Design a protein with these regions (language model features):
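Conserved internal helical-beta-strand scaffold that buttresses enzyme catalytic cores
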Residues: 2-252, 262-588
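Hydrophobic positions on the alpha1 helix immediately C-terminal to the Walker A/P-loop
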Residues: 257
Length: 588
């Protein structure tokens, strides 16, 4: 039964059904009754396992195929008509050739299965920020996960009306054949196709595929920005809430910052933090010339291992009801879940992420390192009152960060917008090669968008520079590094809630309330301007954390030039002059 008369939608659904040949088609209306019926059906096939209703009400466990447990960058393509529009950081294939290849794989891929039609919205339905999509899938796990991660159902179809302005998404698990696994974006056709995967990041098409890869291209064409950023509201003791966005590569503490709990000395004074978003921000220029942000998602798709009462109590609290856990440990004694880093008490009677009997003493991991929770944002104790706002929140600061042992100081402010774009473009994290003890590879991840930018990274930087010209009141741009180490390799900064001490200085800079010292890199705090009360950090350590090693930075400049070289004439001239200016300052 079609839920819409929109021919742009019904015709496409019919075409895709003729290709995939499902046994039946079910339109998702967004009602709890229909979702409950689907969850019940998935329990019958083992696709979902119901967990302890008393301890984890409305929660389920899902296990993906062992060969299908993460995003696959090597199988992810941007198929723009011209290869140069995809750029050197994306995989590209000619769209015609790719469609042909994909249609061959989709042909009959849903035989004997049901095709579900999911109308979904990124952003609050009916808001200026909202963009709509339809995902076709043969997976109930995808349906119930999309119902958490996005706003779904009949209201979305009503908002689309008879327009052709929506993103088409086709997903089929097919055979789960890793050799024929593709996650493909056709930016000019507003189309996403994902096949032979059942894993979240590849199949919840609203997330990275739409909200970043396709949306970044839409933003370029429509004068807005889709960014891989958290959105955090910081409420000071006067009751004023100020907002920051933050871009961090994976394993750099993004979720912890998004759900930050102020240190005790701050809590006592009345500081509070509010989560607007933990992963994606859509940013538009407001009538006041400021940048306004919304979180287009409706849930959190978080990494489970390491999430604990100590590391991130807010994230853990968000998973206590109506959550889907993927590839974690199942405790057979009380039918709950566990993962490494949750606590020190792994269950004795349990199944690992593959569903095999697990012995917690044999050294094997019970949960997959990339195991996940899909939880409604509304469950989070610190979810912002502005979460459902149609206009979003005004952004005072953009914070970039990476994981560097020695180069980047704890915090510095860029000199201006273009310099800030430069700071974001050189973002990097380094891996430690444990065997040799040497600091290993520096992985550049500009604006944390390397895997998610839907077009040429050089054009993306140009778009940032162009946006700066259109903002009469732009946010100030900062870089942080929570991961500086001493000569023994120990972290010098406590991180977690104590990061608020740095964010306080950042916001003070945005509102002209605190001074700074100019260095070769930009503006840094005076040691006395960071509140260390109760942090356990001495002023000497802080001074060390703020030091700029000119020799290291001159080496860094070489690495940046090598990185920039691959973009050829797509590198904005503003960034070329920023690297020249930085080298000049360092040589003085």
């Amino acid at each position: 039964m079609n839920l819409t008369n929109n021919v742009h939608i019904t015709k496409w659904v019919e075409e895709m059904a003729a290709l995939c040949k499902p046994e039946s088609i079910v339109w998702i209306d967004g009602s709890e009754e229909q979702l409950e019926q689907l969850r019940h059906e998935a329990m019958g096939t083992g696709e979902l396992i119901k967990l302890n209703e008393e301890k984890l009400p409305g929660c389920y466990l899902h296990r993906s195929d062992p060969n299908d447990v993460a995003r696959v960058e090597g199988r992810t393509f941007i198929c723009s008509r011209r290869q140069e529009d995809a750029g050197p950081t994306n995989n590209w294939m000619d769209p015609k050739e790719m469609y042909e290849k994909l249609y061959g794989i989709y042909d009959g891929s849903m035989k004997g299965r049901t095709m579900y039609v999911i109308p979904y919205s990124m952003g609050v339905v009916g808001s200026d920020f909202a963009k709509y999509g339809i995902e076709l899938t043969d997976s109930i796990d995808v349906v119930v996960s999309m119902a958490i991660m996005t706003r779904i159902g009949k209201t979305v179809l009503d908002a689309i009306g008879d327009s052709a302005d929506y993103i088409k998404g086709l997903h089929s698990k097919a055979e789960l054949d890793p050799e024929k696994r593709y996650i493909v974006h056709f930016p000019e056709d507003n189309t996403i196709m994902s096949v032979n995967s059942g894993y979240g990041g590849n199949v919840l098409l609203g997330k990275k595929c739409f909200a970043l890869r396709i949306a970044s291209t839409l933003g370029r064409d429509e004068d807005w920005m889709a960014e891989h950023m958290l959105i955090l509201g910081v409420e000071n003791p006067q009751g004023e809430v100020r907002y920051v966005c933050g871009a961090f590569p994976s394993a750099c503490g993004k979720t912890n910052l998004a759900m930050l709990i102020p240190p005790e000395v701050y809590r006592e004074k009345g500081w509070k933090c509010w989560t607007v978003g933990d992963d994606i921000a859509w940013l538009r220029i407001g009538p006041d010339g400021r940048l306004w942000a919304v979180n287009p998602e409706n849930g959190f798709f978080g990494v489970a291992p390491g999430t604990s009462e100590k590391s991130n109590p807010n994230a853990l609290a968000a998973t206590k009801k109506n959550t889907i856990f993927t590839n974690v440990v199942r405790n057979l004694d009380d039918n709950t879940v566990w993962w490494e880093g949750m606590d020190k008490n792994p269950p004795k009677n349990a199944e690992n992420w593959k569903g095999e009997k697990w012995d917690c003493t044999d050294g094997s991991k019970g949960a997959h390192p990339n195991s996940r929770f899909t939880a409604p944002a509304i469950n989070c104790p610190c979810i912002s009152p502005e979460f459902e706002s149609k206009t979003g929140v005004p952004i005072s600061a953009i914070i970039f960060g990476g994981r560097r042992a020695k180069t980047a100081p704890l915090v510095y402010q860029s000199r201006n917008w273009d310099h800030g774009v430069f700071v974001g473009s050189i973002m990097a994290s380094e891996t430690t090669a444990a065997a040799t003890g040497k600091v290993g590879v520096v992985r550049r991840d500009p604006m944390a968008m390397r895997p998610f930018c839907g077009y040429n990274m050089g054009d993306y930087w140009q778009h940032w520079i162009d946006m700066g010209k259109k903002l009469s009141n732009p946010p100030k741009i900062f870089n942080v590094n929570w991961f500086r180490t001493d000569d023994e390799g120990n972290f010098e900064w406590p991180g977690f809630g104590d990061n608020l001490r740095v964010v306080e200085w950042i916001l003070g800079r945005c509102f002209g309330e605190v001074g700074a010292v100019e260095t070769e890199l930009g503006y840094e705090p005076k040691a006395e301007d960071i509140n260390l009360d109760g942090s356990g950090v001495s002023e000497e350590t802080l001074e060390d954390l703020l030091k700029v090693d000119k020799g290291l930075w001159l080496d860094e400049c070489k690495g940046i030039r090598e990185y920039y070289a691959q973009f050829g004439d797509k590198l904005p001239k503003e960034l070329a002059s920023e690297i020249d200016a930085l080298e000049e300052r360092l040589k003085k």
